[in-house]
């Protein structure tokens, strides 16, 4: 029981470190769309985008398919 608890604790800590590393990468300069003011991001979160810039943008969503719901993000 104690060993299982320890394993779970280590797994959670590692997951948090992984998330923090990924968030740090998102802050890096991003590749913008043709207009220089757009990027593509997932509907669930502006941080889940294809090139790391949507967290700085406003998300406007459209739904091409039920399984692939993406947003166009524009800097206002």
Curated annotation (Swiss-Prot):
Range of residues in the leader sequence: 1-15
GO CC annotations, alphabetized: extracellular region
Alphabetically ordered keywords of this record: Disulfide bond, Knottin, Secreted, Signal
Subcellular location: Secreted
Disulfide bonds listed in the record: 39-54, 46-59, 53-73, 61-71
Superkingdom of this protein's organism: Eukaryota
Coiled coil: none
Major location category of this protein: secreted
Positions of the propeptide removed during maturation: 16-36
Free-text tissue specificity from the UniProt record: Expressed by the venom gland.
Family indicated by similarity: Belongs to the neurotoxin 02 (plectoxin) family. 09 subfamily.
Record remark on domains: The presence of a 'disulfide through disulfide knot' structurally defines this protein as a knottin.
Protein name: U10-ctenitoxin-Pn1a
Originating species: Phoneutria nigriventer
């Amino acid at each position: 029981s104690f060993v299982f608890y320890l394993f779970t604790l280590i797994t959670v800590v590692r997951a948090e470190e992984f998330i923090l590393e990924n968030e740090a990468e998102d802050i890096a300069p991003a590749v913008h769309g043709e207009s220089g003011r757009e990027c593509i991001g997932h509907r669930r979160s502006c941080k889940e985008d294809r090139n790391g810039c949507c967290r700085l943008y406003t998300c406007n969503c459209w739904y091409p398919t039920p399984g692939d719901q993406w947003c166009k993000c524009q800097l206002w």
